A protein has these predicted regions:
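N-terminal export signals
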Residues: 3-8, 14-37, 41
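Active-site-proximal cap/lid insertion segments
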Residues: 51-57, 66-78, 223-229, 237-283
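A short beta-strand-to-alpha-helix junction
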Residues: 54-55, 77-81, 98-103, 128-138, ...
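Loop/turn elements at helix/coil->beta-strand transitions in domains of secreted/extracellular proteins
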Residues: 55-58, 92-95, 148-151, 228-231, ...
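Short, solvent-exposed turn/loop segments enriched in Gly/Ser/Thr/Pro and often Arg
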Residues: 74-79, 91-113, 154-165, 236-241
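Catalytic-site neighborhoods of secreted/periplasmic enzymes
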Residues: 110-231, 243-262
Length: 283
């Protein structure tokens, strides 16, 4: 067992075991852009009531980067996200999460350890010299679910280990860091350096991340199913993070692009980005 507050860790493990038996993987029929349905609202407090369900649910956890929650009426008229809606109807939606930090590394450290940043020590992004890698002594969701009997796997963006983003060049990767991710409680990681996503990072890499997730489900996931072993797969996408690096300057007006630390680009020349949705941005 990794170091930490034993009482707190045991409480987290007990909660995760209960959730694994029902709450996380159950289909609760929630509306992604509103409150859960009546059946979901009554089912949510009843995780203990579902704990007696035989077997454990497989858990597919999909994490996007920098995607805000839209309340009813905030999206433009006619705008729909059918894939989001399908996931909401078939899976579990968390509508009461409060963001702990608007910076990537601190926020991800809390999501994957259930501890605040004063405990994870991840106060800023790992690509800054004053931040070290997250300690492998800190139990993660992967560690806790492994204790509960799950096979745990991870795909995509991590941004919690310094070495992941400094050793490899994206064009000529030499190390995939599978062994290093085992120390954080996750198997089957395959990275070409950490995909921390600067300009067009999501556009370039999310297809690869999604494909790795699908490949895992068709391969390892099916094998585990025949063995009767429950699994947890975390698929970590980059977008809509690309918006941080969009160049909105008009031709001949280098206003935004002056005196900045990173690279920015206009939107890709892709039909996906061609459609316009004219509506007022939040103040």
């Amino acid at each position: 067992m990794k170091n930490g507050n034993a009482g707190v860790d045991e409480g987290r493990r007990a909660a995760l075991k209960t959730m694994g038996a029902g709450a996380i993987g159950a289909s609760i029929g929630a509306d992604l852009f509103g409150t859960p349905s009546a059946s979901a609202a009554t089912a949510a407090p009843g995780a203990s009531a579902r704990a007696a369900t035989p077997g454990a649910y497989n858990i597919l956890f999909i994490l996007t980067d920098q995607e805000r929650y839209f309340r009813p009426g905030e999206l433009p008229a006619g705008y729909r996200l059918p894939a989001h809606e399908s996931l909401a109807q078939r899976g579990t939606v968390f509508v009461n999460h409060q963001i702990n930090s608007c910076v990537c590394t601190p926020s991800r450290s809390v999501l994957y350890t259930d501890r605040h940043i004063q405990h994870t020590k991840m106060f800023d992004n790992t690509n800054f010299p004053w931040i070290s890698s997250m300690s492998t002594e800190l139990p993660t969701v992967g560690d806790m679910l492994r204790d509960a009997g799950y096979y745990t796997a991870y795909k995509g963006k991590w941004h919690l280990t310094k070495e992941f983003e400094t050793v490899n060049d994206l064009g000529t990767p030499t190390k995939i860091f599978t062994k290093e991710m085992e120390a954080y409680g996750f198997s089957d990681y395959f990275g070409v350096g950490d995909i921390i996503a600067h300009d067009q990072g999501g556009y370039l890499h999310d297809g690869i991340i999604s494909a790795m997730g699908v490949n895992w489900l068709r391969g390892r996931g099916m094998t585990l199913a025949t063995q009767g072993k429950p699994w947890f797969l975390a698929v970590n996408l980059v977008n809509p993070h690309d918006i941080m690096f969009i160049d909105t300057d008009r031709p001949g007006e280098p206003v935004q692009s002056r005196n900045i630390l990173g690279h920015i680009r206009p939107e890709p020349a892709d039909p996906l980005y061609a459609r316009q949705w004219p509506f007022d941005l939040p103040a």
